[in-house]
């Protein structure tokens, strides 16, 4: 299943060292999620502390487990939307498939 996840980071004030440690752990965890094929894309919302991610997970429980593993989870306001394939995507996939088959 694919999900659009909006994550608003509300990390409190803390020492620079502690903030750097948490941010480093967050980057490392995100890289692991990318390597596992769970985190597909991650974008910023300009002018905010919000990120929007495209995640793939087997089900909502797996996604919850992934998100709750984020080092900043306790400070995030998260909204999740399940995604369905748009008919245009199906047409594009079919067109690519037929082009590859004839090449």
Describe each model-derived feature in a short phrase.
Residues 1-103:
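Conserved, structured core segments of small domains
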């Amino acid at each position: 299943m694919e999900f659009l996840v909006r994550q608003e980071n509300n990390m409190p004030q803390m020492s620079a060292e502690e903030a750097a440690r948490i941010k480093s752990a967050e980057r490392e965890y995100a890289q692991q999620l990318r390597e596992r094929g769970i985190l597909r894309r991650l974008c910023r919302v300009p002018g905010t502390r919000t990120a929007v991610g495209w995640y793939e997970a087997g089900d909502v429980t797996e996604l919850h487990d992934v998100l709750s593993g984020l080092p900043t989870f306790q400070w995030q306001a998260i909204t999740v939307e399940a995604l369905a394939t748009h008919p245009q995507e199906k047409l594009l996939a079919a067109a690519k498939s037929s082009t590859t088959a004839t090449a």
